[in-house]
């Protein structure tokens, strides 16, 4: 779990997302409250439930990106799902309980990786020993008059020399034959609602078939070392302990990001005739958000302390169109602002992995030096903003379209311009995009 303070979390988010201070503060406080709750003594700790967040704002302003970056900072089980993928129980489609099942799978993978990191150095030593056993078989018993001690000393000295060469990578390209455990056979079974437990038993029965069998393979030592390290680390893990920790991690620290929640409101679905009732999805989501127990293959998982962050553009609907019970489960509401020309300019250059840096790095691989003048950046931002105003407002995503169109010719012929410098200024931008950005019909289809 992350121990960062809210200010540190906001500072990290600022490296990747421009503006939206209110939303950043809300998620930073929510994340910090997970840590604070863990410090509270037990009877009261169970009563402290997370305050779920509803983010409201047009598309392309950073709602999903905030959630994505938060997942990396949280060091906790995190899943992002679209509310539109789910249907009311009884209809064809995914039911909402699968959210928790997917989350627990992510948690198990996360926990297993964390536990494997703890034993990796010991596993690496054992993997090295196995490779050295292949390269340097143990000497046969020495006959009459032989000096067994002397032979062992020689063998140990040779082993240490080979171990040093192995660690320095001098033996990486040498091939060895080794016996590796075959991975268990994966099998997916479509399960009707309520029959998950039975299908899990069938799946585990099939996965056990063939487990423990060895397969002889010829691989390079570099790959062999990795494969054997993973195999040795897996042997050291206690799978039951991993599952218990994973379930506990989901229950105490899990975060679910529900995107497009505005698309399942009743107003958004008026006059839809025979379409699946989206209001039914809201009713199915309600117990999950309120706190319920979901049956998974790793055991029962309580959702009482899972943090839910919902987001939606709410163009055609209002938050009040959600059913009242669900509205009450998202007490913290944050409105995200539309992006200005200055925001677009900052997105292009001010973030850690800005679009400008990405394209410069891509073209540098072909020895083309791409430079952006300040007036060129400003003009790009103005065009992106203007096209959003005139056509559909898709927020920062418009920049991808505009810059891709701008650099289309440079990217296409980069191989013929190795060692050259290309400067993107306002004149270059107008020459490449002027006609398209001015003509509304053209910009509708091209940008």
Swiss-Prot record:
Pfam family, one: AAA_2
Gene3D superfamilies: 1.10.8.60, P-loop containing nucleotide triphosphate hydrolases (3.40.50.300)
Keywords: ATP-binding, Chaperone, Cytoplasm, Nucleotide-binding
Stored SUPFAM superfamilies: P-loop containing nucleoside triphosphate hydrolases
UniProt-annotated binding residues for ATP: 18, 60-65, 259, 325, 397
Cell compartment(s), UniProt: Cytoplasm
Quaternary context: A double ring-shaped homohexamer of HslV is capped on each side by a ring-shaped HslU homohexamer. The assembly of the HslU/HslV complex is dependent on binding of ATP.
Protein name: ATP-dependent protease ATPase subunit HslU
């Amino acid at each position: 779990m992350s121990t960062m303070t809210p200010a540190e979390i906001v500072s990290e988010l600022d490296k990747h997302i421009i503006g939206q201070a209110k939303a950043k503060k809300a998620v930073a406080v929510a994340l910090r409250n997970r840590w604070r709750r863990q410090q509270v003594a037990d009877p009261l700790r169970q009563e402290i439930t997370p305050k779920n967040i509803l983010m409201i704002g047009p598309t392309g302003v950073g709602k999903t990106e905030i959630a994505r970056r938060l997942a990396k900072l949280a060091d906790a089980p995190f899943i992002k799902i679209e509310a539109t993928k789910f249907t009311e129980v009884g209809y064809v489609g995914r039911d909402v309980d699968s959210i928790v099942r997917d989350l627990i799978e992510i948690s198990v993978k996360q926990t297993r990786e964390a536990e494997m990191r703890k034993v990796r150095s010991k596993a690496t030593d054992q993997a090295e020993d196995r490779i050295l056993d292949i390269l340097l078989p143990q000497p046969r018993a020495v006959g009459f008059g032989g000096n067994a001690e002397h032979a062992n000393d020689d063998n140990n000295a040779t082993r240490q020399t080979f171990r040093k060469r192995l660690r320095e990578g001098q033996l990486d390209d040498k091939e060895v034959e080794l016996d590796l455990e075959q991975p268990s056979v994966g099998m997916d079974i479509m399960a009707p609602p309520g029959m998950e437990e039975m299908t899990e038993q069938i799946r585990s029965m099939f996965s056990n078939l063939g487990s423990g069998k060895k397969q002889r393979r010829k691989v390079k030592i570099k790959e062999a070392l990795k494969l054997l390290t993973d195999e040795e680390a897996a042997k050291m893990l206690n799978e039951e302990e991993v599952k218990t920790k994973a379930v506990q991690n989901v229950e105490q620290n899990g975060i679910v990001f529900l995107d497009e929640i505005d698309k399942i409101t009743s107003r958004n679905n008026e006059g839809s005739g025979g379409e699946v009732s989206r209001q039914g999805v809201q009713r199915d989501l309600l117990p999950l958000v309120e706190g319920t127990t979901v049956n998974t293959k790793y055991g029962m998982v309580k959702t009482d302390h899972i943090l839910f962050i919902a987001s939606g553009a709410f163009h055609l609907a209002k938050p009040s169109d959600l059913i009242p019970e669900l509205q009450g489960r998202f007490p913290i509401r944050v409105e995200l602002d539309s992006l200005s020309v200055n925001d677009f300019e900052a997105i292009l250059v001010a973030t850690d992995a800005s679009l400008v840096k990405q394209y410069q790095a891509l073209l540098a691989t072909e020895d083309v030096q791409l430079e952006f003048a300040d007036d060129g950046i400003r003009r790009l931002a103005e065009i992106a903003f203007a096209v959003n105003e005139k056509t559909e407002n898709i927020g920062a995503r418009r920049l991808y379209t505009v810059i891709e169109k701008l650099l289309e010719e440079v990217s296409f012929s980069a191989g013929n311009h190795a060692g050259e410098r290309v400067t993107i200024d306002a004149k270059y931008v107008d020459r490449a995009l002027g006609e398209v950005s001015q003509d509304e019909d053209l910009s509708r289809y091209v940008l």
